[in-house]
Amino acid sequence: MRRKFIGVICRVLCATVILCGCGAEVKMPEQENLPVLTIGSDEYEPFIYISDSKTYEGIDVDIAEEACRRIGYRAEFKIIRWDDKDTYIENGNVDCLWGSFSMDGREDAYQWAGPYMTSKQCVLVRTDSDIYTLNDLNGKKVAVQATTKPEEIFLKRSASDIPMVESVYSFVETEEAFAALRKGYVDACASHDYRIGTYLKNALSKYRVLDQELMTSHLGVAFSKGFDSNVVQKLSAALNEMKSDGTIDEIMRKYE
């Protein structure tokens, strides 16, 4: 069963939503006068986030800037509300969705550039939890980010090893899902392994990650069906080249 938090829980967590939606100006380095590829994403460290110096940083930021450079474009980033992502590309507010976005199960929903890397979907629990396997999640409460693969996995239960949880709590931002786990509102939180790893840097002793992962995701860049397919193909070729020449591996090591 899927539920949304209301009342006091929403008030506790709403600050995250307000901050993410504030639309503060973000500085970008000066670049050549090139055609722009407008990239939509939410803040999802370490893939894309706004640094203290008000610049975009992260794995996907570095990959996007280099891939765009190789095809003669300039990457321009726009923070969006992730559960409204399809509206943004359908209305042309952004050209593509790029932010640790899983292609799996969505192959026919968009034009894709990639995949350019893989990521595991994992489950995070508190250190003192009695949950050690996916099966232990039966009857438990799980927090996820709305419209992500973990949400889909727990709601649809398309694989036989996915447990029947009591409730799936869907949040606009992953930080809210982590907060729900931290405050004891839920028993577990599911997200990308890199995202969980970033969260654990400051709280390693308080949490642990289950050995069993939910799935392995192939990450890509999503465009609407009506977008210029030549640009999509060129970007996909650039990403493949970056995988082959070690550029993507080098970028990933930077954020370990």
Regions found by a protein language model. Give the residues of each.
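A ligand-binding cleft/hinge motif common to bilobed small-molecule-binding domains
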Residues: 87, 100-109, 153-156, 180-216
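Extended ligand-binding regions for polar small-molecule ligands
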Residues: 23, 61-70, 131, 135-136, ...
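Extracytoplasmic small-molecule ligand-binding "clamshell" domains
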Residues: 28-100, 170, 245
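Periplasmic-binding protein-like
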Residues: 41-43, 118-125, 197, 201-240, ...
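A conserved helix-loop-strand patch within extracytoplasmic ligand-binding domains
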Residues: 73, 81, 114-164, 226-228
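C-terminal motif of bacterial Sec signal peptides marking the signal peptidase cleavage site
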Residues: 17-21
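Ligand-binding cleft/hinge of the Venus flytrap
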Residues: 49-53, 64-73, 150-171, 200-205, ...
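Bacterial N-terminal signal peptides that target proteins for export
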Residues: 1-12
